[in-house]
């Protein structure tokens, strides 16, 4: 629990009332558990590695057990290595419960949030923490709201392209090394690997520059969902590049498919403008409009019309 960011702690509004020595207990599973069955004495398949969430129902049953002097289930529950217990709705557990929990060093936490809201927020936080992660070389920028991961060989111009995009009002997320996490199984969230050196760029011939200081806080983002990958490569005259845009390429990162665009680089090509156009075109696709397919259908329709009119005219017809 100590590893939570300050923002995440504030969103959960947690307050420790007992078991402070156990705040460093490891949390190894992102799921939650409602301990109703455990309190009733059923200890088969105990999900003891999960965070134990006590709502109003569990609290009412807990009070009934304590009033009847039935401490057995509670004492046995604390023989397991529980990461922590959280009481929602601002409920403060009875002193007897805190006394039974103290020897196990299980933190007892209280939050003002409802059980449903706490579950949603906890799952969001834990999903981010336990998300599979990979680090890739590239530059992550936000262009017209679209997260673009610029990749390519060293020296192809990734940082220079990103710098021009920042100059044009877009935002930098990470340069050189991007940490990518798969959240909820289908979203790729990218960020800088090291916060202390984040939002710095290395420009050959110029050195290290601080984007925040040069362009202001409006030119950066802490994290962004990756919605497109742009592969910059040296122009290869023997390679056939897509000129219509009807061929949709994809790449896979952490088992998530992402649209891929291959852009050949050579003198005279304005790569930043091409990336801006690619970002706007991607937004159109997400809105249901595919420019290349619309153009292709228009051409086919025109060809069909010409083919239908052809039998009615002869080459020597004059008007």
UniProtKB/Swiss-Prot annotation:
Q: Which residues participate in Mg(2+) binding?
A: 159, 202
For this protein, what is the EC number?
A: 2.7.11.-, 2.7.4.-
Is this entry keyworded Metal-binding?
yes
Pfam families (alphabetical): Hpr_kinase_C (PF07475), Hpr_kinase_N (PF02603)
Amino-acid positions noted as binding ATP in the UniProt annotation, renumbered to this chain: 152-159
Q: Which cofactor does it need?
A: Mg(2+)
The UniProt annotation puts the region (Important for the catalytic mechanism of dephosphorylation) at 264-269
- Quaternary structure? Homohexamer.
Report the PANTHER family cross-referenced here.
HPR KINASE_PHOSPHORYLASE, PROTEIN YJDM-RELATED
Misc. comment:
Both phosphorylation and phosphorolysis are carried out by the same active site and suggest a common mechanism for both reactions.
Q: Which protein, by its recorded name, is this?
A: HPr kinase/phosphorylase
Instruction: Please name the source species.
Output: Treponema pallidum (strain Nichols)
Lineage of origin = Bacteria, Pseudomonadati, Spirochaetota, Spirochaetia, Spirochaetales
